[in-house]
Design a protein with these regions (language model features):
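C-terminal motif of bacterial Sec signal peptides marking the signal peptidase cleavage site
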Residues: 15-18
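Positively charged n-region of N-terminal signal peptides that target proteins for export
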Residues: 1-7
Length: 516
């Protein structure tokens, strides 16, 4: 039935094109035809990159004065008849593709103004997007952020860079310095016209939090409507990440969430309380989060580990102590780093994953005290084991940290603009990378992609972002036994300061990369 309605709509469009503003009395000659050549039945194109350039050959068995029209309409639209959008009124077409990734129909109409006879040709346009595979780099100029996309058509090695792809699509940049990138496959939105799951890149800056459709790279929500209750001021620390039962946003050190099992429209709820008294709190700008469990968070105000039990409710809870452990509350510590290491499945009677991670902590009353804390999370229970960091260690004066996801028991860190690793089993430290003069390290991260279904794309890379007077570089290293290879696998380069990187492909989901 919908097909019949749709064909009727197209027929009416053609009829209107033939007859609108045309009061002449035409004599239609028998057997008139207009022949259109040079247009294929199907074209496959990349949105925001390709131009469709066609030069059809038009001929007729009648003397004619021709006028032309190109139109495009969307297929498989439920509940409404989609109008034909005119994109040109010339014989030759030169059209930059901006449509969303899906099937469209291109209509070419030729009208003989002398007789009123009209011929049209339909062509299927299969619009794809390059946004769904590649390296996304979140960068800024000190006050405004944007995204660069590095295309990888055959392997993780980049072959082309698209500068400022976010602002190219949306016509504006994102306010604030970049802080974090994450990805949801089931973010709820109405960007397709009906509420449903949306593959969304989550972009966090010091002044904005946005959900962006990875299909079109168009903004779904930003700080004006991504929180319930209307526009909300965003400030550091600001991050969006995933847990086992909810999506989370930290804004100005306060926690918001979207419970995964709730009916929602992609908006984070009100600020969560930390206790029944609604005591003030300030979450550390670091966390251990994955799809295996509720996140491990740390409140620097009360010096306590906290989480949101089962991703639901309006109040965080303290972890129950899983002895033997150091105290988990009122620790007289600030968290400098908390990160995910691995998840281990526990069989009967637990039937759940234990998440293991590490944290770096500094004393409050004695700032010279620093320690490594090994964390073992069994649902709402937490066991924490502490080891003092000696002041002679390079790790003692580290400024940035990154754990290896499930690989060697190594903690990577930055000291004096150099990348080192620290063996968590024996405390051995080793220099790994010194950037060239004039380059300053802006972030480090381990990214491992092992999806067998994505033939040719799996990788295991340690990433180092740097900035210089001329722009940014992102060094990508393979490694062996926890040590970086001397020569980078590849180096991505662009303008501005790189703050974060994320790999996107059709097979990437929330659980592909831990949210460190």
């Amino acid at each position: 039935m919908k097909t019949n309605i749709f064909l009727f709509s197209v027929a009416m469009i053609v009829l209107l094109f033939s007859c609108a503003k045309d009061d002449s009395n035409y004599t239609y000659s028998d057997g008139e035809y207009i022949n259109i050549e040079g247009i294929q039945n199907t074209y496959t194109l990349i949105s925001q990159k390709d131009r469709l350039q066609l030069s059809p050959v038009v001929s007729s068995n009648k003397d004619g004065d021709f006028e032309y029209r190109w139109g495009i309409y969307e297929t498989s639209v439920q509940g409404r008849v989609e109008p034909l959008d005119t994109i040109a009124r010339t014989k030759d077409l030169d059209y930059f593709i901006t449509e969303d990734a899906k099937a469209w129909v291109l209509v070419f109409m030729v009208k003989n103004k002398k007789t009123g006879f009209t011929q049209y040709k339909n062509t299927t346009l299969n619009i794809n997007t390059e946004f769904t595979r590649g390296w996304y780099v979140l960068k800024d100029d000190g006050s405004m952020s944007d995204l660069d996309l590095f295309l990888i058509p055959t392997s993780p090695k980049s072959q082309e860079r698209i500068d400022n792809i976010y602002s190219t699509v949306n016509g504006r940049k994102i306010e604030g310095k970049g802080t974090f990138l994450s990805f949801f496959t089931a973010y709820k939105s109405t960007i397709t016209g009906a509420l449903g799951n949306t593959r969304a890149l989550m972009v966090s800056t010091e002044k904005d939090i946005q959900s962006i459709s990875i299909n079109s790279l168009k903004t779904i929500r930003d700080k004006n409507d991504i929180f319930l209750g209307g526009p909300k001021e965003v400030g550091p620390p600001s991050f969006v990440f995933m847990g086992s039962s909810a999506n989370y946003a930290i804004n100005k050190g306060q926690l918001h969430h979207i419970y995964a099992m709730s009916a929602n429209g992609g908006q984070f709820g009100d600020r969560l309380r930390i206790d029944a008294k609604d005591s003030p709190y300030q979450l550390a700008p670091t966390f251990c989060a994955s799809t295996y469990s509720d996140p491990i968070l740390f409140d620097n105000t009360s010096s306590s580990f906290v989480t949101l039990a089962n991703g639901s409710g309006s109040m965080m809870v303290n972890f129950a102590e899983d002895a033997p452990t150091i105290p988990l509350t009122n620790m007289d510590r600030n968290a400098l780093f908390i990160g995910y290491k691995e998840a281990v499945y526990l069989p009967a009677p637990v039937y759940a994953f234990q998440v293991n991670g590490y944290g770096i902590f500094q004393g409050k009353s004695d700032p010279t005290f620093k320690s490594i804390v090994y964390m073992e999370q069994n649902q709402q229970k937490l066991k924490a084991t502490e080891q003092v960091i000696e002041s002679s260690k390079k790790l003692y004066n580290a400024t940035q940290y990154a754990l290896l996801n499930g690989d060697e028991n190594m903690l990577f860190f930055v000291n004096n603009n150099q990348v080192w690793n620290y063996n968590l089993s024996n405390a051995f430290e080793q220099l790994q990378f010194t950037p060239p003069a004039g380059e300053e390290i802006t972030f480090i991260r381990h990214l491992k992609y092992t999806t067998a279904a994505d033939t040719g794309y799996p990788f295991n890379l340690f990433v180092v972002g740097v900035k210089s007077a001329v722009g940014y570089k992102v060094y990508m290293f393979t490694k062996s036994s926890g040590n970086l290879d001397a020569t980078p696998y590849q180096v991505l380069e662009g303008n501005g300061t790189a703050r974060a990187i994320f790999y996107i492909s059709p097979n990437v989901n929330e659980g592909t990369f831990p949210n460190n």
